[in-house]
Amino acid sequence: MKRKLFAAMAVTVFGVLAGGPAHAGFLFGEETKGVTINNNESDLNVRIRLQPRFDFGDLVKDGTSSYESQGDIYLRRIRLELGGHLLTKTIAYNLTLTGDKWDKAGNANAIGIQYAYVKWLADDALVFTVGKEKLPFSRVSLSSSSKQLIVERPVSTEAAKKLFGLTDAYYQPKFSVGGRLAEGLFAYEVAVADGWQNGEAIQSTGARKVLSANPVYVARVELSPPGWVEKGKSDAYLGKGQHLTIGANVASQSGIEYQTVGFEEDRTLTGFDVSGHYNGFTAQFEYNAWEIESTDPAIATKKPKGWYAQAGYFIDGINLEPVARYEVYDHDSEANDKEEKIRTVGLNWYGKGHSFKVGANWVHHEFDTKVKEVTNDDSKDIYQVQAQVYF
């Protein structure tokens, strides 16, 4: 009964929101880009982003046996973004403060630093970055969460982001060199970062902690045909333009030595993706596989892998966008019965482009025996409604 009520509420909300004028443009005007303060060659742009969220469905567990339906209202993301140029237009900087899953059940509220970096834009083909920023792997993860097609990113890519560190592993201090050549037909980035560090708990088996490790090295390349170059990464283009990009990445950290026991492990990740859009239609495919190879017999080798395919179609005038995604995440391909399958369908409405929008998703998980979260249920359903205010 509660699920039917929730579905009816969601349909009603979207019916009201979509009831604006059926013509090109958004109900509340075009997107805003924050406030910019200029001082000669230096400038500062300030932006604020809020993502209120309501979840309902199989959110809590009755001990270890089954799920219980429950609702949860929280702020999925809070962002304060400060960015611009320093002294010259060839030196860019960014400082972004973040609060994730604020007041979500079971979450410890905390303010953190998502980005803190400086870039030297020596040339289109040569950009140097130093500071805290994303490591260059996973197409869907490199796209801003402000421009996601679907409310949450895929389960497998979220797991891959935790491969090279304990805390905020995907957003860690790095030094990188990247750029675009041949008018953007070829793009690249090569990065080095600390990865796993001394004292961090890396394996629950045997309570293994890190003694020392080599740096993590990451490289990504992208190719696009002439006339189909992507100007900036996004999942949702709101019916404008076209792009087609093939991407590949590899990341590796070796010689991660455990404390006291004398064993060590190596970690590698490889990935491949294809993304494209033409006017209102957008689609994306991504595959990632990673390996954790330990000399500790109690840990041995693990090989998770996952892929997803997602698509959406932006309907101009009413500014609605039906979306869907199918994902398979194998928690360890070295073992049997460890697959998780996730199906997502939803609808986005854009009132002011990405500056004000609302998305609603139904997410259905199916679990193999060895990755079930509870003993009595091998599936769960979650309903999500999320708004974004970005100014």
Range-by-range predicted roles:
Residues M1-M9:
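Bacterial N-terminal signal peptides that target proteins for export
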Residues V11-T12, A22:
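Cleavable N-terminal signal peptides
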Residues L17-A24:
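Sec/Tat signal peptide C-region and signal peptidase I cleavage site
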Residues F26-E31, N39, L59, S65-Y67, ...:
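Outer-membrane beta-barrel pore domains
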Residues F26-N198, A213-G227, K303, Y308-D332, ...:
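Outer membrane beta-barrel
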Residues L142, E189-A191, G199-A207, K231-G232, ...:
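A short secondary-structure junction signal
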Residues W196-E200, Q253-S254:
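C-terminal ends of transmembrane alpha-helices
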Residues Q203-V250:
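Loop-centered beta-sheet repeat module
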